[in-house]
UniProtKB/Swiss-Prot annotation:
Region annotation (Disordered) ranges: 27-61, 819-840, 1025-1046
Single annotated GO MF: helicase activity
SUPFAM superfamilies assigned: HAND domain of the nucleosome remodeling ATPase ISWI, Homeodomain-like, P-loop containing nucleoside triphosphate hydrolases
Gene symbol of the encoding locus: Smarca1
Record family assignment: Belongs to the SNF2/RAD54 helicase family. ISWI subfamily.
Catalytic reactions of this protein: ATP + H2O = ADP + phosphate + H(+)
Entry superkingdom: Eukaryota
Tissue specificity note: Predominantly expressed in cortex, cerebellum, ovaries, testes, uterus and placenta.
InterPro entries: Helicase_ATP-bd (IPR014001), Helicase_C-like (IPR001650), Homeodomain-like_sf (IPR009057), ISWI_HAND-dom (IPR015194), ISWI_HAND-dom_sf (IPR036306), P-loop_NTPase (IPR027417), SANT/Myb (IPR001005), SANT_dom (IPR017884)
Residues in SANT domain copies: 847-899, 950-1014
Protein name, per record: SWI/SNF-related matrix-associated actin-dependent regulator of chromatin subfamily A member 1
Induction entry: By ovulation in ovaries (at protein level).
């Protein structure tokens, strides 16, 4: 049996002078109320609380309920619903206590607590600020004990007094210093206040949202709360902590560091690992806290639904803001006594998303979304100060938010510098191409497709980051890693200079980008420069994430750079060992960038944190950053007052996107050269610091109304007068026009060339030299005897002499005058063919392959490429209309006299490429045969030596199936990968493996090529070992034994 709760609290208070046990009666608990009493007074009050609370504990303790159920067996038999009633008694008591607490906070909760059947959604604009009227029969369940402002009848007052006299006092433990069970170090003052706030919520049966700014220790405060439940309330668990996959390792480490007395398990792994873990770890129940990820909860919801969780904690609570999402529906099905949401971003959701969070926390209070939406209408709420106060009053009991500047005075400062950079020549060319492709959109004034505008924005942002993000932009193949990676991007030029300076200063860097393909480029850059780095993005497996974070945070780590994707690496990861953050590109949502900065600027940081944001000047990026700054400033004004941002203000309008795209377009069109300069990094930083200060000063001066009315196109505001936009009227007649760049022409100062261009008269070509009219047309691929070509040439020269042909000068060849004289000399000295030569010519004309046409020759060359020069049978089948004997005869002459052909180099290169492919196929087939031959049952036994090249997506079972089926079907078959794709889809073991079933034939080909390379490498290693062993055995001298005969 569990010890009595109040007794436990008093006992701990006596033994631990750190805690103060306070009897709270009709007092509003909260983080701002603290009693300064000593341990002795705490023990005395705790004892008193124990005596007062005995009756209540005897009624509400589930263990005592079980004893009562055993003692009154006959009563249980008489009433079949007796047990259910007894179990629900403490839940009803908690609900009543919760309602009482909420009504003491503000009378507005009476509107939500009254039965929904007796009320309909009513706008608050039409209601008085008072308790809603209800039927007399319902008053018993709705009267708030803490509400003394309204007149009562005598009978009601008597009933209230009787009810008060029967109530017991609440026992609430509040800490003034760090609790003794927290072992990793003392809690800070504001963390102790946060812990007390969480305890007060628990004691009053209310769930809440801990929304401290990122880096203030929400994890630690939550762990301390669970430790309080175990050590002061004797409630060790079970508790569930639901976190993003990237933070699992961090949560486990924090539990071990701060409250090692809590027994914590981490639920993660593949299907087989999970099944064993459930059987061996979870079901025995030898644990207090289960830490798991969203994905695990969705996959194993049936297991988690078997437990009644004492506390259900969800980190990064914005994941359940949509009540219709799969995760949100599943966690609502879990049975839990208390719930806690953690989020590092303020409540900037629309009203319905806010209701979804509150409905998860208190479903019995916030059970109607329509009622909530009508009670706090967004438009009226933003305009009516009274309704703003009401909303603030509703959120106050559930929400605790502190920011670093208010509570953490010892944290080093954070300074952000925006570095403005120009475009390189290649970037400017691609930027112009993108704009020119959609110039009709830029110059349109009618309807625009929003998705098309978003796509243009995305392409322009890629160009600002690095032109190599576009296929075909990088020079190659072969692809090289050298200076061009830096020189073709303005941001990379600045980053290269900045990293060199940071390295000299002994600092370490976090680089964030939204584009994982850009991280690939940065990886190549780091390898080229010799910088040691770690990488984390959305595709990084959980184990590799842990290894990368641990390696970077290790003492005296040699890792200089940690590159992360903004979305995957911006949540819940502690990288305070770095003190420089570089935002390579900016997110649409400024809160995401703040989360990224807080990976370094958090508790534990010893150095001032410098944040460098790279921005390409006179491009769409400049407008994106400006819009984010305005949004962040507006949020800071509104949200910190407990208000909500208007949903429409967060949406990016089509007109706003169009103005972003248009911004800087004229500037880009006007200039074609690179804007990059040779400035040193100090000058660049000074200029960026100055521009950042100017922007911050401008934002500080702008009030809420100015920020709301701010538009990207400043000129447009000139056309607004008395609430009417005269620019829109003007657009009906005219359209804002961006002039595309003019077509460039090279200057040409040759007068003749100028007039030829003006009159469009092309320069006359040199006429072909005449040939005898009846001379036969012979081709080099027909392989006539060489003597025939000599006789034909002699005949041609004499014909030209007889017609008086003069050789023209050809300016395209070197030394045209000399060549002209020599050719004319041959013509002038030409002689006719003698009768013997004429007879010889006719005879030689029969000795070539006269029946072979150009088409036959091309078929012969392609067949040699396809089958190799030795496979005459297949080559003969490819040449249409020729017998195998004819092809064999031609092939023999071809390979003997191929050097006589004009394009022999090109032809031989074509054939040799084909033969190389044939040899490659043969070697692959041998490698597969050797690999398969090592196993009796390769479909089950085959193992692949991955080394460090294991992919992130394919499992070993999938790879084994691909290799075995490829060998079975024949590697060199036509359309083999399409057939392999069908086999995968029909395989029963993959019927639920949607990843591999959704791969294309091309993706299977790429994967098989990777696996074949690994197999070939493995075969080579085996062959080398065998050769070494043979050589070792051969070099051993045989031992000769001599025997003596007597």
């Amino acid at each position: 049996m569990e010890p009595d709760t109040a007794t436990e609290a008093a006992t701990v208070a006596v033994s631990d002078a750190r805690a103060t046990v306070v009897v709270v009666e009709d007092e509003q608990p909260g983080p701002s109320t603290f009693k300064e009493e000593g341990a002795a007074a705490a023990a005395t009050e705790g004892t008193t609380a124990t005596e007062k609370g005995e009756k209540k504990e005897k009624i509400t303790s589930p263990f005592q309920l079980k004893l009562a159920a055993k003692a009154s067996k006959s009563e249980k038999e008489m009433d079949p619903e007796y047990e259910e009633k007894m179990v629900n008694m403490p839940l009803k008591a908690d609900r009543a206590k919760r309602f009482e607490f909420l009504l003491k906070q503000t009378e507005l909760f009476a509107h939500f607590i009254q039965p929904s059947a007796q009320k309909s959604p009513t706008s608050p604009l039409n209601m008085k600020l008072a308790r809603p009227r209800v039927k007399k029969d319902d008053k018993q369940s709705l009267i708030s004990v803490g509400d003394y402002r309204h007149r009562r009848t005598e009978q009601e007052e008597d009933e209230e007094l009787l009810s008060e006299s029967r109530k017991t006092s609440n026992v609430c433990v509040r800490f003034e210093v760090s609790p003794s069970y927290v072992k990793g170090g003392p809690l800070r003052d504001y963390q102790i206040r946060g812990l007390n706030w969480l305890i007060s919520l628990y004691e009053n049966g209310v769930n809440g949202i801990l929304a401290d700014e990122m880096g203030l220790g929400k994890t630690l405060q939550t762990i301390a709360l669970l430790g309080y439940l175990k050590h002061y309330r004797n409630i060790p668990g079970p508790h569930m902590v639901l976190v993003p996959k990237s933070t699992l390792h961090n949560w486990m480490n924090e539990f071990k560091r701060w409250v090692p007395s809590l027994r914590v398990i981490c639920f993660v792994g593949d299907k087989d690992v999970r099944a064993a873990f459930i059987r061996d770890e979870m079901m025995p129940g030898e644990w207090d806290v289960c830490v798991t990820s969203y994905e695990m909860v969705i996959k194993e919801k049936s297991v988690f639904k078997k437990f009644h969780w004492r506390y259900l904690v969800i980190d990064e609570a914005h994941r359940i803001k949509n009540e219709k999402s799969k995760l949100s529906e599943i966690v609502r099905e879990f049975k839990s006594t208390n719930r806690l949401l953690l989020t590092g971003t303020p409540l900037q959701n629309n009203l319905h998303e806010l209701w979804a969070l509150l409905n998860f926390l208190l479903p019995d209070v916030f059970n109607s979304a329509d009622d909530f939406d009508s009670w706090f209408d967004t438009k009226n709420c933003l305009g009516d100060q009274k309704l703003v106060e009401r909303l603030h009053a509703v959120l106050k009991p559930f929400l605790l938010r502190r920011i670093k500047t208010d509570v953490e005075k010892s944290l080093p400062p954070k300074k952000e510098i925006k570095i403005y950079l120009g475009l390189s020549k290649m970037q400017r060319e691609w930027y112009t191409k993108i704009l020119m492709k959609d110039i009709d959109v830029l110059n349109s004034s009618g309807k625009m497709d929003k998705m098309r505008l978003l796509n243009i924005l995305m392409q322009l942002r890629k160009c600002c980051n690095h032109p190599y993000l576009f296929d075909g932009a990088e020079p190659g193949p072969p692809y090289t890693t050298d200076e061009h990676i830096v020189g073709n991007s303005g941001k990379m030029v600045a980053l290269d200079k900045l990293l060199a300076r940071i390295k000299e200063q002994g600092s370490r860097v976090l680089i964030f980008s939204q584009m994982t393909r850009l991280l690939d480029i940065l990886e190549d850059y780091c390898m080229w420069r010799g910088y040691e780095y770690s990488r984390l993005d959305g595709q990084t497996p959980h184990e590799e994430r842990e290894e990368a974070i641990d390696a970077f945070n290790a003492p005296n780590s040699s890792k200089f750079i940690f590159m992360l994707s903004t979305r995957a690496g911006g949540l819940g990861i502690n990288l305070a060992s770095a003190d420089v953050v570089i935002l390579y590109d900016s997110d649409w949502n400024p809160q995401v960038d703040l989360q990224a900065m807080d990976r370094a600027h958090r508790i534990g940081q010893k150095k001032p944190v410098r944040v460098f944001r790279l921005i390409t000047d006179n491009t769409v990026e400049e407008r994106i950053v400006e819009r984010a700054e305005i949004k962040l400033r507006l949020d800071s004004i509104v949200i910190q007052q407990g208000r909500l941002i208007d949903q429409q203000s967060n949406k990016l309008a089509k007109e706003e996107m169009l103005q972003m795209i248009r911004h800087g377009a004229t500037h880009v069109f006007a200039c074609k050269e690179s804007e990059l300069t040779d400035e040193d990094i100090v000058t660049i930083l000074e200029r960026g610091e100055k521009k950042t200060a100017e922007m911050n000063e401008r934002m500080q001066k702008m009030g809420e109304s100015s920020l709301r009315n701010f538009r990207m196109d400043l000129e447009q505001s000139l056309y607004k007068f008395e609430g009417e936009d005269y620019r829109e009227k003007q657009k009906l007649g005219t359209v804002e026009w961006i002039e595309p760049p003019k077509r460039e022409r090279k200057a040409n100062y040759a007068v003749d060339a100028y007039f030829r261009e003006a009159l469009r008269v092309s320069e006359p070509k040199i006429p072909k030299a005449p040939r005898p009219p009846k001379q036969p047309n012979v081709q080099d691929f027909q392989f006539f005897p060489p003597r025939l070509f000599e006789l034909l040439e002699k005949e041609i020269l004499y014909y030209r002499k007889t017609i008086g042909y003069k050789v023209p000068r050809n300016p395209e060849i070197p030394n045209p005058a000399i060549a002209q004289r020599e050719e004319q000399k041959k013509i002038d000295g030409a002689e006719p063919l003698t009768p013997q030569e004429t007879e010889e010519k006719d005879k030689l004309l029969t000795q070539g392959f006269t029946n072979w046409t150009k088409r036959d020759f091309n078929q012969f060359i392609k067949a040699n490429e396809k089958y190799g020069r030795d496979d005459i049978d297949n080559i003969a089948r490819e040449v249409e209309g020729k017998s195998p004997e004819e092809v064999m005869e031609y092939s023999a002459v071809f390979w003997e006299r191929c050097n006589e052909l004009q394009d022999i180099e090109k032809i031989m290169a074509q054939i040799e490429r084909g033969e190389a492919r044939i040899q490659r196929r043969i070697s692959i087939k041998k490698a597969l045969d050797a690999k398969i031959a090592r196993y009796k049952a390769p479909f089950h036994q085959l193992r692949i030596q991955y080394g460090t090249s294991k992919g992130k997506n394919y499992t070993e079972e999938e790879d084994r199936f691909l290799i075995c089926m490829l060998h079975k079907m024949g590697f060199d078959r036509e359309n083999v990968y399409e057939e392999l794709r069908q086999c995968v889809r029909n395989a029963p073991q993959f019927r639920f493996d949607w990843f591999i079933k959704s791969r294309t034939a091309m993706e299977f080909q790429r994967r098989c090529n990777t696996l074949i390379s690994l197999i070939e490498k493995e075969n080579m290693e085996i062959e080398e070992r065998e050769r070494a062993e043979k050589k070792k055995r051969a070099t051993k001298t045989p031992m000769v034994k001599f025997s003596a005969f007597s």
